[in-house]
Amino acid sequence: MKRDIKDLLNPALRNIAVYKVDGGQEAAVKLNQNESPFDLPFWMKEQILEEFRLEPWNRYPDILPFRGMDAYADFLGVSRDSVIMSNGSNEMLYTIFLACLSPGKKILIPEPSFSLYEKIALLLQADIVSVPMQPSLDFDADSLIERAKQEKVDFIVLSTPNNPTGKSLASPDIARIVRECDAIVLVDEAYIEFSREHSVLALIEECPNLIVLRTMSKALALAGMRIGFAIANPLLMAEIAKPKIPFASSRFAEITLQHVLRYYYLVTDAVSYILGERERIYAELEGIASLDVFQSDTNFLIIRVPDAQKVFHALVSSGILVRNVSGYLLMENCLRFNIGLREENDQLLEKLKSL
């Protein structure tokens, strides 16, 4: 008799669920996926499409997207051999984890953090060392360093600013972790453009164990293009590149990135708007007695309500989609929503005040 199909698969799959977005991805007011509320202007899309029209569609793209890597390296002011572009930062996460983890290797993950970290670590049969955030949802840098040393971890991943908490780890504390811990340290800066803290990109040259991860899905409004980057010391980057999927990024994504970087003032304007709205909404939420709101360094806010599931469904019934993040450690009855257009934000505020 043949074995059950599940017995032929990676045993880690038994402890992993398919990724899903509760509530779906369609709503009149969609604030559940931390997207930018601003699409690219039509005139830029026309320029991008005209350039892409001239590309050979029957040919593979470059093994690695060198045009995109050159453009982003120039933008950051780093060498090209310090940069790799990927098909979204999630693909880069898989690549980095493949390069750094194997059965028995130890990875330290602050909890809560982006759920994909744990999922990939489980798939690779690595040992996960979890370090809880403080009750305020802030990082505990001393505990991170202490546990990393005690457990002799091989790999540390830090989402800062953090998803789902919205909190940043102070830049000097990141530097301490990178310098004091005998481990590869991945700093996921998906939301860095919205943070009060500085990027740790400047540490790349002096810290051979540091990797910085970036996405173009948030501040650059390119979630649909799937563009991510890793930046690291060239010697480390050469190793990370080994498990990288070849031909994974399209020419279309490269061309789009080049145009957005050329007109970066549009990104700066959008970020300024989001930061202003974040502060306005935060102040409004502070005046609602039935909820607590947390300070944020991202393009989203976290609120704690008496009954998150009830409020979530009430919002959905009004055409407003947010994210229920109550399942995360320390985040019972918490909801997350990104900053939208002003009229969308006002609809959310009005509904929350009425509940």
UniProtKB/Swiss-Prot annotation:
Alphabetical UniProt keywords: Amino-acid biosynthesis, Aminotransferase, Histidine biosynthesis, Pyridoxal phosphate, Transferase
Domain of life, source organism: Bacteria
Gene Ontology molecular-function annotations: histidinol-phosphate transaminase activity; pyridoxal phosphate binding
Stored PANTHER family: HISTIDINOL-PHOSPHATE AMINOTRANSFERASE, HISTIDINOL-PHOSPHATE AMINOTRANSFERASE-RELATED
Substrates-to-products reaction catalysed: L-histidinol phosphate + 2-oxoglutarate = 3-(imidazol-4-yl)-2-oxopropyl phosphate + L-glutamate
Coiled-coil features, chain-numbered ranges: none
EC number: 2.6.1.9
Subunit relationships: Homodimer.
The family this protein is said to belong to: Belongs to the class-II pyridoxal-phosphate-dependent aminotransferase family. Histidinol-phosphate aminotransferase subfamily.
Originating species: Chlorobium limicola (strain DSM 245 / NBRC 103803 / 6330)
Biological processes annotated in GO: L-histidine biosynthetic process
PROSITE patterns per record: AA_TRANSFER_CLASS_2
Disulfide bridges in this chain: none
Keyword Transferase: yes
Protein name as annotated: Histidinol-phosphate aminotransferase
Pfam families membership: Aminotran_1_2 (PF00155)
PTM annotation (N6-(pyridoxal phosphate)lysine): residues: 218
Cofactor: pyridoxal 5'-phosphate
Pathway membership, UniProt: Amino-acid biosynthesis; L-histidine biosynthesis; L-histidine from 5-phospho-alpha-D-ribose 1-diphosphate: step 7/9
Keyword DNA-binding listed: no
